[in-house]
Amino acid sequence: MNRLHLVLLLGLLGGAAGQAIAQERETDPEIRELRQQIEAMQAQLDSLQTRLSEIQQQSTGGDAAEPSEPSDPRSGPEYAAAIDAGDEADDGVEPQAPTPAQLDQRISSLETVADDWTSAIRFGGAVRLNYAWRDYDEGSKDRVGDFELELFRINADGEVGDVKLSAEWRRYNDFHAIHHAWVGYEFNDEIEMHLGISQVPFGILPFASHGFWFGGTYYLGFEDDYDTGVKFIHKPNEDWTFHYAFYKNPEYADDSRFGRYSFDLVTGGDQQNSETNQFNLRGERHLFIDGLGTLDVGLSLQQGRVFNDFTQRKGDRYAVAGHADANFGRWNFQLQGIRYEFDPQNPVGVDDDFVQTGAFDFPFLMAAKGDVYSVNLARRFNVSLGPITGGACYNDFTFINPKVRDSADSIQNVTGCSIIAGGVFAYFDWITGKNMWFVGGDGIGRNATTAGKWRSRLNVNIGFYF
């Protein structure tokens, strides 16, 4: 191997580094591949340096001969650029090769860009413990409740270039599930897009409740719901916010999966209905009241289809909501009304008055049509008691009036307080319910044996967020 071959290899190596830098600037998923290229290039450089030492020992006078004047018509600046880009030259042409110092500088630059991309994403998470005592569970009463690990979660948020990223994965005791995962882009100061699994824009956002247990609307799928599609957030000025969204399906296309965070229609047994092709429109007016605070009032519309796997036919579903969300000093007041309806195309013999929904690994039946009313009140506190720096006390009330045959009203009320202490956030909730799922009921809106009975649950959730 002569010096001509050596400098050509160094030139090709320099061109590969240039290509890697250009490619790294374009796509984030290639960072791992680029790091591998860096390691390969470093190995080649070490080998070439060893060979160079051998050649120098064999050369007379210790100096290498200068390259001859190129005679090929491809010579000159254009050809040198081609060599730098990694193109192969004729054996008779010996372009200027990058020095080891220059190559090290290119590698260092590439690693810096990769580190910048990695540091643009911020990682966090939470570990939560939960204590529960239930008066409708004899075992729970005999044990005086149960205390266990409730959740471990990891989330990532940040920006890479002009693209926003946000994702969260959760592990519960009996299942794991995606919470959300989307990429976003701001077209301008007014319009932002989220593509992926995002929060459905419906009713009071981000939550129509204050406690850990959420409001009754959560268990109907109308609070903190996440589906897969595209959402646009439009803020033409400080007085208005609009949402426009299309969701192809829930966060999981597998409708038989009960292990999920959001409540959706799920399939099982003779209930084979699933959600598809959903449109959402939401508008909210922000009012500033002198001497009092702020008042947000809004309207929401949700329209979609219900696909039945048995009949292969599509039914309709819709929901409309009006809401008010007021913040007067340390007080927050929420008022919301919802009307919803599912019109499934079931086979003969399957009751159309109830549909099967589910999450947290449990399916249940809910009334296919009804009105929902929420009245919530909370007060925030700033305190200085050891590590405790703040908190709130609240009462969240939900009344569900089904509009189908053989049904009964469902009620849920949550009274509690939350405490903030550094990275620790704790909820202390007393939940009471009648004919309400997850509070001793057989479902929501069902006229079952437990319909007229009030049930209670004490729930304490302590989470460390990092």
Task: Describe the role of every protein-language-model region.
Residues 7-16:
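Bacterial N-terminal signal peptides
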Residues 22-128, 466:
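N-terminal periplasmic/intermembrane-space "pro-region" immediately following the signal or transit peptide
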Residues 110-253, 284-291, 374, 407, ...:
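Outer membrane beta-barrel
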Residues 118-124, 153, 162-164, 192, ...:
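Outer-membrane beta-barrel architecture
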Residues 140, 253-274, 309-311, 343-365, ...:
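Solvent-exposed loop segments that connect transmembrane elements
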Residues 281-403, 411, 452, 456, ...:
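Detector for outer-membrane/organellar transmembrane beta-barrel domains
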Residues 420-466:
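Predominantly the C-terminal beta-signal and adjacent terminal strand-loop region
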